[in-house]
Amino acid sequence: MKIIIDGDGCAGRDIIEEVGKKHSVKILIYCTINHMINSDYSEVRMVDGGFQSVDMYVANNTEENDIVITQDYGVAAMALGKGALAISPRGYIYDNDNIDRLLFERHLSQKNRRAGGKSKGNHKRNKEDDDRLYYNLEVLIEKVKAILN
């Protein structure tokens, strides 16, 4: 088990590292060369700045029972397809019961924007998001530990 972070624009990294350290789980952060990320605990892997480069590195380096942290539903879907677990930086768990709906909603939003419509953005990150991320990341780690033991 390892935690893989889609690092471009990933809030909550300090919480993820705190939980990872607590459970001695290796953390890999993938980010483009345009984002300078430093960490005393995680291994930071810089990739080229091409379109969806980070997404492809995350997907290609995800294995069964890994935990992927991403706000991208497509990356989450690829992780789930490989037998990994996935969670958003706000602590929402992606699973086979909700990923199809999320992908469809994303498709509808993109279609609406192309037609000139507007979509509302995410709310500002708050303590509730931090608490949800901490708690649900703990839940996923314990779930993987139970599978591996």
Swiss-Prot record:
- Note the NCBIfam families from the entry: PRK00124.1 (NF001095)
Q: Which residues form a coiled coil?
A: none
Query: What Pfam families would the database entry show?
Result: DUF188
Superkingdom assignment: Bacteria
Q: What are the annotated disulfide bridges?
A: none
Family statement drawn from the similarity comment of this UniProt entry: Belongs to the UPF0178 family.
What species is this protein from?
A: Clostridium perfringens (strain 13 / Type A)
**Transmembrane intervals:** none
Q: What is this protein called?
A: UPF0178 protein CPE2266
